[in-house]
Amino acid sequence: MLHKIRLKPGLDKQSSDTGAEGKWVNADYSRFRYGFPEKIGGWEQLVSDNLIGAGRDQHTWVDLAGNKYAAIGTNKCLYIYFEGAFYDITPLDTARQQTGATFTTVSGSKTVTLTTSTAHDAEAGDIILCSTATSVPGGFSASDFDDILFEVTDVPSATTIEITMGSTAGSSAGPSGTVTIDFYYVIGPLIQTYGYGWGTNTWSGQTLPLIQTTLDGALLNDTYGTGGSGTDIDLVSTTGFASSGTILVDSELITYTGITSNTLNGIVRGTNGTSTAAHSDGATTYDASTYVGWGSASSSSNIVIEPGQWRLINYGENLMALIHNKTIFQWEPSLPNLSVRAVLVSGSEVPTASRDMVLSTPDRHLICVGTETTLQSSTTQDDMFVRWSNQESTTVWTPTATNTAGSQRLTDGSKLLGAIVGRTAVYIWSDTAMYTMKFIGQPFTFGFQQVGTNCGMSSQHSAAEVNGIAYWMGPTGFYKFDGGRVQLMPCLVEDYVFEDINTNANQQIHVAVNALFGEITWFYPSNASDYVDRSVTYNYLESTAENPIWYTSSLARSTWTIEGVFNKPYATEFKSAVAPTYPTVVGISNGASYYWQQEKGTDEVFASGTTNAIAGYVESGDYDIGGPEGEQGEGEFMMRISRIIPDYGAQTGDSRITLSTKAFPSSTAVATNHTATTSTTQLFT
């Protein structure tokens, strides 16, 4: 007797295998469509180059001439993809430019030391651009440096930078010669960590605004204070500094026991595992005392060093790019401009520190969330403060009686995590609540309403709107908002997902909409990984209240853009052990992103032609054996299975069917494998 097996679409990972009778319980690289499982589509590499860093945001748009672009921001660089090629448009931090730096070489060594005349504020891992080199020593030439990018290998002091060449020096020489050094804007760390304990990297205080001042006199590479004597350090100002505590100067931590006027007393140099170093007069000095217990295990701190993030949008045909907790850049997409770098949005009123940015439509106000209360003052950044520009302007932000610029502070939560533009409102999330921001016109311009509590989002890029409904991933569940109320979504894979998320890396969570198959996917890092390595998908087209359809996968993408501008979704995948190739940076460390066209064929295809098969599977829960006339057995029937007739729609490659049988729910299953080479293969057991 033939027995038809039909199972509900979606996975049930909340129940035991026996409790999930009639359902699927495991799957990988598979989706459910029209009620049946199928393998997901393949992907094809768009460009042979691998990008530096991990993708953090991606945006596609069309300019006024009809040209199609994709912008990709990683934790290291900003790129344009246009007609099959990448273009590096990473902005330069012009305020940090160093001219007249000198070279020092050591015979037989690849290390070259660049000495600057003033403090460079660089960190190991930064990218620098050298130019106008003259009289280069050690057997190197100007062509080895002019218009060449380098990764900073080490920072021995406030005025020295070490880089690694591709070949060794022929002689020891220097300091001599000159070179101009430009610095790529620092986007932020690769991974999210807790605390400011040494080893987590403070990024020169550039990740979060700290109380800061400058040295009033140089420090030598010794154990003494200002000028190489005593136990006092003179600062330009001590306003806001703790009465006793710790300061950070370049990469050195220094403790002090008291303050007299603008002088720190009782200093101890090179504390908590750091080394003493020379620091020039005017070097930036941070008060680290109130942010973390220095020397404590970072896992005990609730202070988060967030990973480098971007928000990419278009304003008309121009790309607007916000570095998380920093400022706004703009790139104009005229064809001759493809190799021109993004530049700061100019103006004396533009915010310099914001957590996220959106453009409201159709009224066209640029909105910054988690931004500064005093324009052009990053130290006044308030994580709960919202500010918007004058209508149709990116540079006018000061409210007046004759414009529509304005601001509003929200209250529920400790910080605003992100915002998106919805069909009828801008949606803003804190770590605990959701707000709507609607254009209402003069005199207030925007009206705010809190529409949900205890429903915060998990990361800046974890929310999307589809068909007028906002969906997002919170710290412990999935939510949706249909314009009326926030609802917690029933999910039969939630324990599997939320018990396996690396909460030290959850800022990397990225949402993806695949309208081709009615899917919303969240890519997340599992407990076993510092980077995105898994995903969970909700099928919004076929789900019902009685049967919400969810499934999980090891498909890992750090960014994703919906089809529309291009006919398929485009996505980035980060690989920590892969060497980046674009742009060419001498001495660059491993850690690169592939750029994929999704839903292309059935395999993984690299630009080199290398093809890897994608092995998808689905696994059901236990299934009772049926008795006469379809009677369910509930365990009292025994059966011998002699043949299987698969019913496949379209099959590429072989399909293996595994039967796992057991006499009792707690018995060890016995598995047998059978391979179907075509969709009409009959299997005899």
Label the predicted regions:
Residues 66-69, 317, 424:
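Structural hallmark of WD40 beta-propellers
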Residues 1-96, 189, 194, 311, ...:
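Beta-sheet repeat architectures centered on beta-propellers
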Residues 77-81, 189-198, 328-333, 373-400, ...:
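Short beta-strand segments and strand-loop junctions that repeat across beta-rich extracellular domains
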Residues 54, 74, 116-118, 157, ...:
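Repetitive beta-strand solenoid architecture
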Residues 1, 89-232, 236-308, 337-339:
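Small/polar beta-strand repeat architecture
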Residues 42-61, 90-95, 292-305, 337-509, ...:
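Beta-propeller and closely related beta-pinwheel folds
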Residues 88, 186, 317-331:
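Hydrophobic or amphipathic alpha-helical targeting/insertion segments
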